[in-house]
Amino acid sequence: MGTLCSVCKRRPNPVDTEGKVINVTDDFEEMSETEIMLACPQDKKLCKKPKESMYKTKHKSNKHGI
């Protein structure tokens, strides 16, 4: 599970294919919902973030229940 969340916190980047983790913790709050979905298109449902992060990044998702 932890690795899925790591993927969600990375921007889509060719460097990721080499296994390098790009730390964008500061930028993550500013990422749009679209960018987050691009960062992890398959794992977005499996990647459960703390509710604090969900409110900051994906306001609409809270209506679906976590």
Curated annotation (Swiss-Prot):
The record's account of how the chain is modified after translation: Phosphorylated. Phosphorylation does not seem to be required for recycling to the host Golgi apparatus. Packaging is selective for underphosphorylated forms.
GO biological process, one term: viral budding from Golgi membrane
Membrane topology: Lipid-anchor
Keywords attached to this entry: Host cell membrane, Host Golgi apparatus, Host membrane, Lipoprotein, Membrane, Myristate, Palmitate, Phosphoprotein, Virion, Virion tegument
Subcellular location(s) per record: Virion tegument; Virion membrane; Host cell membrane; Host Golgi apparatus membrane
Assembly and oligomerization: Interacts with cytoplasmic envelopment protein 2; this interaction is essential for the proper localization of each protein to the assembly complex and thus for the production of infectious virus.
Function: Plays an important role in the cytoplasmic envelopment of tegument proteins and capsids during the assembly and egress processes. Also participates in viral entry at the fusion step probably by regulating the core fusion machinery.
Family recorded in the similarity comment: Belongs to the herpesviridae cytoplasmic envelopment protein 3 family.
Full protein name: Cytoplasmic envelopment protein 3
Designated gene of the protein: 38
